């Protein structure tokens, strides 16, 4: 998530100059206007409203991003998430980042409200999908972490976890579709499996 004010503070604290948050916002707008990046807004799933800031930005062309960085910083998890985002846009979805609040009781017996992120809330007409990008789910703990925000939506829209592994698509005991990235990208009906 990107917050121009935090970026400005980072530039200042790292001795990289005094750049205002308004300047950073302008540059982000220039990048969006030139179609180099696009913005996903934050959406409160239970409250059914948009949260004004911070936004999440994705590169429209991963190759240009990689070339600009001289093919360094190859964070596969972020690149995979970016590819999924771009594919959803190509398929005609409006794509937001979902926020789900859930009250939990901690070890002290106190109830605390926690926020969980859903990577993508995808809407097209009357269709809605919740999608998590999970580079891998090597164990039950990671699987529970990835599906937690999906479960806390407490609704009946389709829930999907996309993993990098080349797997046969399957539904877990909670009805969540687990699908490999390759099948997700190559099968036009991959969201309907």
Where are these regions (language model features)?
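Loop/helix-junction capping segments adjacent to catalytic residues or to phosphate/diphosphate-binding pockets
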Residues: 1, 18, 140-141
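Short acidic, hydrophobic short linear motifs in intrinsically disordered regions
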Residues: 1-11
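A short, structure-level motif marking secondary-structure boundaries and short turns
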Residues: 11-14, 68-70
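Short, positively charged loop/turn segments that connect secondary-structure elements
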Residues: 12-23
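A cross-kingdom feature that marks ATP-driven nucleic-acid transaction machinery
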Residues: 22-193
């Amino acid at each position: 998530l990107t917050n121009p004010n935090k970026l400005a503070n980072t530039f200042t604290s790292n001795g990289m100059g005094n750049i205002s948050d308004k300047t950073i916002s302008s540059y982000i707008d220039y990048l969006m206007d030139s179609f180099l990046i696009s913005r996903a807004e934050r959406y409160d799933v239970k409250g059914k409203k948009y949260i004004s800031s911070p936004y999440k930005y994705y590169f429209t062309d991963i190759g240009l991003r990689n070339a600009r960085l001289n093919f360094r910083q190859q964070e596969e998890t972020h690149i995979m998430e970016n590819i999924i985002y771009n594919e959803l846009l190509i398929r005609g979805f409006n794509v937001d980042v979902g926020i789900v609040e859930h009250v939990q009781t901690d070890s002290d017996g106190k109830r605390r409200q926690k926020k969980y992120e859903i990577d993508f809330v995808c809407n097209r007409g009357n269709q809605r999908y919740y999608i998590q990008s999970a580079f891998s789910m090597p164990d039950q703990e990671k699987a529970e972490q990835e599906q937690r925000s999906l479960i806390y939506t407490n609704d009946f829209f389709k829930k999907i976890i996309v993993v990098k592994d080349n797997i046969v698509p399957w539904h877990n005991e909670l009805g969540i579709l687990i699908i490999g990235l390759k099948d997700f990208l190559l099968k036009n009906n991959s969201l309907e499996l």
